[in-house]
């Protein structure tokens, strides 16, 4: 007969074995209980439980307590025997069981949160895939791995992304074509509360331009893009066209668009019983696309000017040397009074649309990629009369390198060497023209060349700033005309090409549309680059783009939406004694701009004083957090130049001395951001127009 001690030892061995098997089962069944095994079976965790049990029991109480009779031990022996005979049938305890299980330690709120997270996971994963342009193949490889861990996800990426099965493209004007419609996007923007229209007016700008898709083939993309002024800078595709060349018929290409825009302008657009008047206000294109849409001579023709009746001259190339020719009118265009200017009849005439003033000249292509790049090329590769020495070029490149750390966060590209100027993007050329050029060129260019460049820089700055535009539009027009006249004298008559000539007409667009950024191609060029990235293989590029666009409708739109955020905590000060208990930060992302206490993003106008932010302080007011800045203003601001007008009037100053006094202001008082560039023993500070 088995002794009492043997029975106790046998019970202890079986319990220990069962515990080990339970641990193994939980690890092997993570798809049933997707919680960390360490969370429930960590040795330190178990040791803690055992200590709690031991503290409540006397030594050997569990086995020696007189309440446990021989009958109880007999029952336990029977149970042990049954368990040993049915080891393979052990199952994890269910939620309905009153026995111990890992989930018994999890609160209902935690389970609910986990359930909600699992429901949101497919949407979050889809948003991630779209944000980073993840291919179908990569996503199809990831999904099975995640499903192995019990995550409720579809097997195929197309199900996750809600990819349309059939895309009904058609052949139009020699290429594959798909039309979305403007009403589709208007409904989406209303649904997302993106539209702010106080007068029930919807104003549409469209853009037409081409971009090659591949480097090894002639396949190109010619979309019709749109923006709604009342919705800000949101770009939406109206139609997608892919072909081996540009559309072979402008009438076929624009047919669907013309039908819809006619209906919208005549009948308006109704949403939630509110009728909105729809107006097509501008068609924004570069020079070749404008000639294509308007059916006129291209930029290399004798009668290429869209704004004035001037016949070009041959000087090794077509030039337009005159600055006072008769201006064209919409009536002249419709009746084709200058037949040599036209090569056909534009379908846009049907809209009653002003064919002269409603086609802005797009300063991105005209000024930045056209005139500024031409000027730099003349300095580097032009005739000896204007060519810079290699030593001067090296000094300029060194200056660009030295000021890189002072360029604010809002500028995606920093200055780089002049040897790379042929690869400079439009944003880099704009940065050079408006901000860095007038400073780094000072003292290196001959005065006559520097003065000519400064005339262009000042004129464009005026046309980009609402306040300056209101006060100095006449001066900007005069400066641009004078620039064109002096440009021919300085660099040669043969340099008065299409882009240079059109500067005399640029101020008219600022009068019609406001600052030039409102009618430029910058946002459209950025969107074109995004469309190009949607093509993952050479077959059926149009269908690929359309599918990806429909998938992208699921994506959370975070464009130009900044969360208020303090970052990079420190204890370096400066800070007042009264605020010493508050948290200090280096950076703050606000709605208006990025604020920092480090070089490049710390020059601002606060309470009509210009200076620099020394520290950012977070204070708690109830449940919310507000911010303060330690701000030190300049002791004096001087003019950087006086011709063609005082730089003070343009918010450009030379500053060398600080007051040495730190003052406290609310973050909300920060009004205007300034860009700083080292110059002599101080800095040139200038108002930042692009945020």
Question: Which residue ranges define each predicted feature?
Answer:
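Polybasic, low-complexity terminal segments and linkers that are predominantly intrinsically disordered
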Residues: 1-117, 613, 631
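E2/UBC-UEV (E2-variant) core
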Residues: 222-272, 310, 314-361, 621-691
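Electropositive nucleic-acid engagement tracts
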Residues: 115-201, 548-549
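Short, conserved catalytic/metal-binding motifs centered on acidic residues
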Residues: 142, 209, 257, 283, ...
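Generic preference for well-ordered alpha-helical elements
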Residues: 118-122, 135-139, 179, 201-204, ...
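Domain-level detector for long, ordered catalytic/regulatory cores in large eukaryotic signaling
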Residues: 148-151, 163, 266-426, 440, ...
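Acidic, metal-ligating active-site segments
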Residues: 184-188, 195-197, 202-243, 439, ...
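Terminal interaction-prone segments of large eukaryotic proteins
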Residues: 52, 56-58, 63-75, 79-87, ...
């Amino acid at each position: 007969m088995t002794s009492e001690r043997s029975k106790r030892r046998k019970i202890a061995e079986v319990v220990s074995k069962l515990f080990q098997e339970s641990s193994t089962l939980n690890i092997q069944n993570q798809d049933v209980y997707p919680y960390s095994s360490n969370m429930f079976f960590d040795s330190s965790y178990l040791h803690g439980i055992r200590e709690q049990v031991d503290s409540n029991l006397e030594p050997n109480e569990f086995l020696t307590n007189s309440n446990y009779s021989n009958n109880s031990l007999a029952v336990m022996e029977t149970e042990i025997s049954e368990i040993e005979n049915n080891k393979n049938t052990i199952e994890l305890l269910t939620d309905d069981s009153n026995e111990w299980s890992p989930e018994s330690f999890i609160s209902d709120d935690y389970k609910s949160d986990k359930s909600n997270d699992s429901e949101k996971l497919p949407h979050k994963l889809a948003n991630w895939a779209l944000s980073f342009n993840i291919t179908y193949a990569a996503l199809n490889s990831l999904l099975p791995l995640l499903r192995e861990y019990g995550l409720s996800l579809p097997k195929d990426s197309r199900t996750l992304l809600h990819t349309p099965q059939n895309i009904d493209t058609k052949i139009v004007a020699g290429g594959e074509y798909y039309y979305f419609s403007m009403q589709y996007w208007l409904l989406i923007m209303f649904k997302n509360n993106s539209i702010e229209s106080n007068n029930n007016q919807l104003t549409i700008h469209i853009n037409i331009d081409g971009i090659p898709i591949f480097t090894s083939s002639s396949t190109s993309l010619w979309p019709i893009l749109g923006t709604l002024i009342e919705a800000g800078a949101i770009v939406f595709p109206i139609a997608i066209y892919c072909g081996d060349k540009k559309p072979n018929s402008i009438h076929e290409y624009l047919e669907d668009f013309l039908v819809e825009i006619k209906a919208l302008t005549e009948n308006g657009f109704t949403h939630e019983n509110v009728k909105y008047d729809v107006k097509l206000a501008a068609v924004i294109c570069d020079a070749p696309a404008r000639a294509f849409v308007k059916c006129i001579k291209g930029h290399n023709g004798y009668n290429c000017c869209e704004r004035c009746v001037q016949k070009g001259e041959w000087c090794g190339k077509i030039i337009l040397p005159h600055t006072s020719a008769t201006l064209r009118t919409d009536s002249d265009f419709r009746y084709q009074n200058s037949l040599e200017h036209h090569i056909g009849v534009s379908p846009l005439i049907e809209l009653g649309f002003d064919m002269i003033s409603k086609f802005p000249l797009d300063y991105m292509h005209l000024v930045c990629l056209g005139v500024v790049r031409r000027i730099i090329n003349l300095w580097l590769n032009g005739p000896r009369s204007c060519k810079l020495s290699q030593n001067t070029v090296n000094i300029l490149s060194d200056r660009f390198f030295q000021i890189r750390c002072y360029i604010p966060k809002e500028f995606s590209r920093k200055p780089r060497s002049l040897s790379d100027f042929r690869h400079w993007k439009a944003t880099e050329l704009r940065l050079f023209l408006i901000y860095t050029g007038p400073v780094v060129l000072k003292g290196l260019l001959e005065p006559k060349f520097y003065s000519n460049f400064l005339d262009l820089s000042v004129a464009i700055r005026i046309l980009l700033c609402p306040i300056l535009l209101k006060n100095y539009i006449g001066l900007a027009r005069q400066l641009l005309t004078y620039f064109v006249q002096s440009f021919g004298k300085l660099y040669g008559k043969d340099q008065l090409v299409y882009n240079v000539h059109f500067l005399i007409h640029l101020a008219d667009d600022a009068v019609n549309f406001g600052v030039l950024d409102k009618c430029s191609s910058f946002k459209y060029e950025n969107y074109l680059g995004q469309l190009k990235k949607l093509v993952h293989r050479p077959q059926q590029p149009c269908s690929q783009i359309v599918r990806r666009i429909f998938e992208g409708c699921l994506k959370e739109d975070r464009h130009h939406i900044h969360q208020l955020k303090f970052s990079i905590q420190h204890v370096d000060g400066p800070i007042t004694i009264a605020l010493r208990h508050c948290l200090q930060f280096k950076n703050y992302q606000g709605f208006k701009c990025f604020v920092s206490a480090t070089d490049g993003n710390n020059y601002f106008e606060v309470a009509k004083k210009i200076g620099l932010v020394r520290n950012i302080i977070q204070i708690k007011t109830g449940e919310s957090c507000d911010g303060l800045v330690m701000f030190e203003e300049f002791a004096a601001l001087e003019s950087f130049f006086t011709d063609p007008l005082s730089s003070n009037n343009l918010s450009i100053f030379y500053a060398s001395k600080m007051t040495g006094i730190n003052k406290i202001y609310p973050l909300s008082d920060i009004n205007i951001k300034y860009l700083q560039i080292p110059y002599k023993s101080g800095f040139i500070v200038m108002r930042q127009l692009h945020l």
